């Protein structure tokens, strides 16, 4: 490693970048083993599990060999040790950052198991909720059915009562009309009987009056006949008297 590469490491740490430049082939492949990039999703009820000990998270390499390598490339011992110390600190910081952003396969499996357990709990809760809702719906349906039956019974009772009341009213009205018709017929019969009686009485009175008139006419005729005879007699007597007087005067003058 030369001074340019070490300076790049210092600059990257100073800027706060999470990317660390390193020469190709100097870091062991064990640093990249058993790491998987994951996307952190908030909102899951999961428990963070840390199964990697702290001593296994540190970058372990032969610092003495690295110091000797730096000395062979033109650095003195103090500079080489300073660079190795800085590289060790940067490696530890980088590993801490990597462990914060990446998980191991075991951690991923545990997280997946926790998520599956959480999903199972949610599924169970959904099943329980569905059963509870179904039971509530069934109870509500039964309650509505009972209420509908009660309303149906009430409607049937009210219908029967109204029908009975209407039938009773119709029968009463029919009886009243029949009684009224009977009374009217009775009054008509009484009126007819009274009229017939009055007519009979009137006819009897008329007949009696006619008979009286006929009797009076007959008596008047008889009286007129008798008066006529009396008048004739009187006239005859008068004529004879006048003739006798005339004969007397005639004889006297003669």
Curated annotation (Swiss-Prot):
It is a single-pass membrane protein. It comes from the Eukaryota. GO terms for cellular component: mitochondrial membrane; mitochondrion. Keywords: Coiled coil, Membrane, Mitochondrion, Transit peptide, Transmembrane, Transmembrane helix. The keyword Transmembrane helix applies. Pfam families: CCDC90-like. The chain crosses the membrane at residues 231-253. Residues 1-42 form a transit peptide. InterPro entries: CCDC90-like (IPR024461). It is found in: Mitochondrion membrane. Residues 129-164 form a coiled coil. The keyword Cell membrane does not apply. Interacts with MCU. Belongs to the CCDC90 family. PANTHER family: COILED-COIL DOMAIN-CONTAINING PROTEIN 90B, MITOCHONDRIAL, PROTEIN FMP32, MITOCHONDRIAL. This is Coiled-coil domain-containing protein 90B, mitochondrial. It comes from Homo sapiens.
């Amino acid at each position: 490693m030369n001074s340019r590469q070490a300076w790049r490491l210092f600059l990257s740490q100073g800027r706060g970048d999470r990317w660390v430049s390193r020469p190709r082939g100097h870091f062991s492949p064990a640093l990249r083993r058993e790491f998987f990039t994951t996307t952190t999703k908030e909102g899951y009820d999961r428990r963070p599990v840390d199964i990697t000990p702290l001593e296994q998270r540190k970058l372990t390499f032969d610092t003495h060999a690295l110091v000797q390598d730096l000395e062979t490339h033109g650095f003195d011992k103090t500079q080489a040790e300073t660079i190795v110390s800085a590289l060790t600190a940067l490696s530890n910081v980088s590993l801490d950052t990597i462990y914060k952003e990446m998980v191991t396969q075991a951690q991923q499996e545990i997280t997946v198991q926790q998520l599956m357990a959480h999903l199972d709990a949610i599924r169970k809760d959904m099943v329980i909720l569905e059963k509870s809702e179904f039971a509530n719906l069934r109870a509500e349906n039964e309650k509505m059915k009972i209420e509908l039956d009660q309303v149906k019974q009430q409607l049937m009772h009210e219908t029967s009562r109204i029908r009975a009341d209407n039938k009773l009213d119709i029968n009463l009205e029919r009886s009243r009309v029949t009684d009224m018709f009977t009374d009217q017929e009775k009054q008509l019969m009484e009126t007819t009987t009274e009229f017939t009686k009055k007519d009979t009485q009137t006819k009897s009175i008329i007949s009696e009056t006619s008979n009286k008139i006929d009797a009076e006419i007959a008596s008047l005729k008889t009286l007129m006949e008798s008066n006529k005879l009396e008048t004739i007699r009187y006239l005859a007597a008068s004529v004879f008297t006048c003739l006798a007087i005339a004969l007397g005067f005639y004889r006297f003058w003669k």
